[in-house]
């Protein structure tokens, strides 16, 4: 890698066309400018100037190095301008959350994206462990977690909580079913569904619930946005956080049946500790808070 100081001295020399003027601009001595030139030539193994009395011309190598020096200065100028301008509507935003919360959040992000062509938002649905790891290694700027991460390198804010819901077709009886009734319908399973069942169904049907591995499975859906679809068509039942129901386009064809023992999942917004948030991340944070507020 070229020595940045020597390159800057050489670029100034080329701009002024004179050793004395270059030394004055850089607040150096003329021998100091000559020394930087010699060191840069030694580093490259090429002569950069051809002397003609008190003046000089650039060699082919010198022309190339001068072009590099000017390009470096332009890059630095653009960098300084970017650092001084904290534009809410430009740059990259990387968010990770559960699939159900992503369904709720994405429609809230779309108007902002439409109004800000310079903005790139990456919203990733991920398991809790991946969200935590991604926040720590810098892959994600913001993450929505199901618990306070309690990590020294992260700071977290409690957003609220959302209920884990039993979801039936809209024409299901408006009463709490027994587990035998649910099993007769069959479970619409999904990646998180088995853990939800062991949590909510075991809590409410302790004598009848046989465990997730023994439930009658009617369907398995791996796309978070389509999990309620079979239930909306009268097929089976499922378990989802409230956000997964609110974001479903045909939620009028679903019935959420409150169970005697209710289960709530916490929502925490986490980011790297000590990192000042630029304007775009502050706005993304505010939109996440707004989305979480829909679940109250």
Regions found by a protein language model. Name each.
Residues 128, 136, 208-255:
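Hydrophobic hinge/microswitch elements
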Residues 41-60:
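A short LG(V/I)-centered, amphipathic sequence patch enriched
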């Amino acid at each position: 890698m070229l020595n940045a100081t020597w390159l800057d001295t050489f670029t100034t020399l080329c701009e002024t066309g004179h050793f004395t003027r270059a030394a004055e601009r850089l607040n150096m001595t003329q021998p100091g400018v000559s020394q930087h030139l010699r060191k840069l030539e030694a580093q490259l193994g090429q002569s950069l100037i051809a002397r003609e009395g008190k003046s000089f011309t650039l060699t082919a190598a010198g022309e190339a190095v001068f072009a590099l020096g000017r390009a470096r200065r332009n890059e630095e100028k653009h960098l300084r301008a970017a650092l001084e301008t904290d534009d809410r509507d430009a740059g990259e935003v990387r968010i990770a959350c559960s699939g159900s919360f992503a369904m709720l959040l994405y429609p809230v992000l779309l108007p902002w994206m439409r109004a800000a062509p310079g903005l790139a938002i990456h919203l990733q649905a991920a398991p809790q462990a991946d969200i935590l790891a991604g926040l720590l290694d810098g892959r994600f700027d913001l993450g929505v977690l199901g618990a306070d991460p309690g990590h020294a390198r992260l700071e977290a804010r409690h957003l609220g909580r959302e209920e884990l819901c039993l979801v039936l077709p809209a024409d299901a009886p408006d009463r709490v079913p027994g587990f035998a009734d649910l099993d007769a319908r069959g479970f619409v399973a999904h990646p998180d569904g088995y853990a939800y069942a062991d949590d909510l169904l075991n809590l409410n049907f302790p004598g009848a619930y046989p465990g997730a591995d023994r439930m009658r499975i009617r369907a398995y859906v791996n796309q978070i946005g389509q999990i309620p679809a079979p239930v909306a068509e009268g097929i089976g039942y499922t378990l989802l956080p409230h956000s997964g129901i609110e974001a479903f386009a045909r939620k009028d064809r679903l019935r959420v049946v409150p169970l005697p023992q209710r289960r709530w999942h916490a929502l925490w917004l986490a980011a790297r500790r000590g990192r000042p948030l630029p304007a775009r991340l502050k706005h993304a944070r505010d939109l996440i808070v707004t989305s979480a507020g829909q679940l109250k």
